[in-house]
Amino acid sequence: MKSINRALVAAALLWAGGAIAEDQDAGSGLLPRALAHIDDYVTADIAKGVVPGATITIVRHGKVAYRRAWGERDPTNRAPMTDDAIFRIYSMSKPITTVAAMMLVEEGRLGLQEPVAKYIPQFANVKVGVERNGDNGQRVLDLVDPRQPMTIQDLMRHTSGITYGFFGDSLVRKVYTDSHITRGDFDNAEFADRIAKLPLAYQPGTTWDYSHSTDVLGRVIEVVSAKSLYAFEKERILDPLGMRDTSFYVKDQSKWPRIAEPLVNDRAIGRDAEFGDPRVPRRWESGGGGMVSTAADYARFLQMLLSSGTLDEHHYLSPKSIAAMTSNQIGPAAGVVPGPFYLPGPGFGFGLGFAVRLEPGVAPQLGSVGEYFWSGAGGTTFWVDPKEDLFVVFMMQSPAQRLRYRIALHNMVYGALKN
């Protein structure tokens, strides 16, 4: 009940009508003079032309401790950054999709242990790519059967064996790159069919490897719910939370001026990939990286998670589901090893849709054991700290600076804690 009351206070004070007061709350336990270091850090980068602009919202004990918008929303027309700016959140779509899938798990319509092929039959024939040296010394890719089926849990924790094509130079990744699976206009059903024809990079359930797994999970949601991914998420998550500006594309032209843009020399989000235009709708609703949102919208989502799955007396998820999602699901006990491109970083494990901090040290940033986070390729990031009853959502469109900011923001926010 205490967490629900905090959530109600948060909703009333912070997000009614989309307005959030910018002044720090005196009871937040965060020192204003220390939080000012964030101002200095961001404004210095803006002055140097390193980032165009950014927004941040820090909430503690259900109240805004700090909120700012700096710089320019669109550097091409010098439009100032605003609180309601719309950002491409890329992989911050993944937690929303995973929450949607967990709703189906709670209803008994989906099981973590179930094979993906139960819902997408094409995955019954998937193969695993294994490299070896050929007679001429060249690398050769052999295809072998999986030792165990790919499961729904594997999709949620990135242990499916599916991969992305932009990390490393393995032969499987080359197959992904050469197949151009994201080219053209297609829906989630066709995407799942395309990716099921490609070899897996690892045996399912053995290795954490960042991937299109959440995109496939989005298709599973469609099959189980008999609705499009967006229709299901809109009905069950976005509309009840009041996330009016969160979607896969911005179809409403009146919102187009609010879309945040990167600097012209900072548009690359990966190998041979640049910022997409959310004004141009496609049939693909990428549950792994296709959404746009605002800081205020995403704050509603995070407050729901921090409030144990209930916000404004509306129940979304059980506290037990959130506990499972934010507990480590990899490591020796699970028989899962981190792959060579382990994005959660040192000191972190991975749950279902979230990286989870396991150690007070090891990681290069300050924080709490049990905090969970994820980020987007375009420069957005968030984390939730249940121990400190705190969450942070930071949004910018600057992929080149995203890792530096993720670490620096942690250090400055926790450096401001006084109790």
For the regions a protein language model found, what residue spans apply to each?
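Short, surface-exposed beta-strand/loop micro-motifs that present aromatic residues
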Residues: 371-373, 378-387
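Bacterial N-terminal signal peptides that target proteins for export
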Residues: 1-8
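N-terminal signal peptide c-region/cleavage motif recognized by signal peptidases
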Residues: 16-18
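Active-site SXXK
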Residues: 36-43, 56, 62, 87-119, ...
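Short, surface-exposed loop or secondary-structure junction motifs
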Residues: 74, 121-367
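Boundary of Sec targeting at the N-terminus
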Residues: 22-24
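Short, well-ordered beta-strand elements
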Residues: 382-384, 389-398
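Short, conserved catalytic-motif segment at the N-terminal edge
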Residues: 26-89, 109-111, 125-134, 274-276, ...
